[in-house]
């Protein structure tokens, strides 16, 4: 199950640069993080759901690549984003 429209709109409002910003790296990483967190709860109940696990690994890989791009191009925005999302410890 994917994120609801309201949840996506809230993430867009929080992380987007402008009102209709859906493609910036920050928004994409925030949406992927929300989907990954949602799927982690799914896997606590459905341990053997390997098809969805493949999708989870794909999302994690995409998020990792976007974060690497953001770190390489604009380190300040990268630091702010990981602090907001609580990704690095």
Curated annotation (Swiss-Prot):
Ribonucleoprotein among keywords: yes
GO biological process assignments: translation
Single GO term (MF): rRNA binding
GO cellular component: cytosolic small ribosomal subunit
Pfam family for this entry, one: Ribosomal_S15
UniProt keyword list: Ribonucleoprotein, Ribosomal protein, RNA-binding, rRNA-binding
InterPro entries (alphabetical): Ribosomal_uS15, Ribosomal_uS15_bac-type, uS15_NS1_RNA-bd_sf
Matches recorded under PANTHER family: RIBOSOMAL PROTEIN S15, BACTERIAL AND ORGANELLAR (PTHR23321), SMALL RIBOSOMAL SUBUNIT PROTEIN US15M (PTHR23321:SF26)
Entry function: One of the primary rRNA binding proteins, it binds directly to 16S rRNA where it helps nucleate assembly of the platform of the 30S subunit by binding and bridging several RNA helices of the 16S rRNA. Forms an intersubunit bridge (bridge B4) with the 23S rRNA of the 50S subunit in the ribosome.
Family from the record: Belongs to the universal ribosomal protein uS15 family.
Subunit architecture: Part of the 30S ribosomal subunit. Forms a bridge to the 50S subunit in the 70S ribosome, contacting the 23S rRNA.
Protein name: Small ribosomal subunit protein uS15
Organism the protein comes from: Shewanella pealeana (strain ATCC 700345 / ANG-SQ1)
Taxonomic lineage from the root: Bacteria, Pseudomonadati, Pseudomonadota, Gammaproteobacteria, Alteromonadales
